[in-house]
Amino acid sequence: MRSEIKSVSVLALGFGLVGIDRYLISTMYPVIAKDLHLGYGDIGTITGALAIAWAVAALWMGNLSDRLGRRRVLVGALLVFSLLIGASGLAKGLMGLVLVRLVMGFADGAFTPASISATIEASALERRGRNIGIQQMTLTLFGLGFAPLAVAALLHFINWRVVFSVFALPGLIVAWLTWRIIPARWHAAEWRERSSFADWKAVLSYSNIRVLTVLMLCWLTCLVTTSAFIPSLLLDHHHLNFSSMSTVMSSIGLGAAAGTLCLPWLSDRVGRKPVVMLSTVGACLMLVLLNSAGANVPLLFCTLFMVHFFNNALITLTVGPLCAESVPAELMATASGVVIAVGELFGGGFAVMIAGQVATRLGISKILLLPTATLVLGLILSTRLRETRPRELRGIQAGVTPAS
């Protein structure tokens, strides 16, 4: 139990730093755009570049962590993060920023599937959903809860270019802790000798994985589109001041953290599929309310909180328990990497680029149409999921001791 707590804690801290790197730029974008003369379409390009690199890294490095063990991939990703996060502040224009975000996206994407599988391996069966929720919630808690408030405070004292460098030292500390705490696990030789293509083909033979890849696209379109464009919507369309915008933006991280903690834990008790369907309906309804909230800061905060309360739980269940429980243990990170790759490439990459063009051509006020449409698609597809909650767990919670 003590080892489980230490492992989940350090993996959660690492994913929190990944979240800061991913979303720090969204809160600062209005300031960066003014300095570098960027437009709405450029938001989509910068955000999409990181997501595409994240997708490629998740696909390859997830499979690599199944072969070489989690620790090497996790520590390597954290070292790249720590050494290069400050480079975002050195960019002189759009292309420089895109190139830096591509490299950072590769580090972030490498960390993600390995950290999910390491969390599941460290967790007792009856605590999988809860522990994945704890580990995953830090992405948005740190990146969209803590970071907007920290940025609003730091920009009073330092230039936006320096803000990125503040998080380099914490990254090095977490890398050292990861090396000390996370064990080096090795799989059987026959798994290491198989090709990556054979592993990808193997995981895609499971119907749940095929459905989950498209669902991840839907959930990430909602997350990335709102986190990237809501600051501009609030400032340019609703005419809020920067402080009010930062307060509203913090609701994304707080709501996502609460939902990621509570709903996967609930799925340990009532099943994965019912929670997925409930959360999809909830997120869709809250997006509709958000679109009609006007410039009412408390209402904007509450509706955006609830959108991500539900949506981030969907992401967590998709890449965590649903993915891991649909394939053999030896392919957990590979399956997670495939699902993340498709979701990031299309939902985090191309979809957000499309959203940038929607904002440019139709106006920033229309930006919520795309995530609403993808959530409706997600609800339809979620009916095709097969329940994966372990039978042993169902027996434990029914008061029945599983047969040995």
For each feature predicted by the language model, list its residue ranges.
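Juxtamembrane intracellular "pre-TM" segments in multi-pass secondary transporters
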Residues: 1, 184-212
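Extracytoplasmic gate region of multi-pass secondary transporters
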Residues: 25-26, 208-257, 320
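Helix-breaking motifs and short loop linkers at transmembrane-helix boundaries and internal kinks
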Residues: 37, 69, 90-96, 239, ...
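Conserved MFS/SLC helix-loop-helix module at the cytosolic interface between two early adjacent transmembrane helices
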Residues: 56-92, 267-273
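Glycine-rich segments within core transmembrane alpha-helices of 12-TM secondary carriers
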Residues: 130-148, 340-351
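Helix-loop-helix hairpin linking two adjacent transmembrane segments in secondary transporters
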Residues: 135-180
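C-terminal transmembrane helical hairpin of 12-TM major facilitator-type secondary transporters
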Residues: 272-322
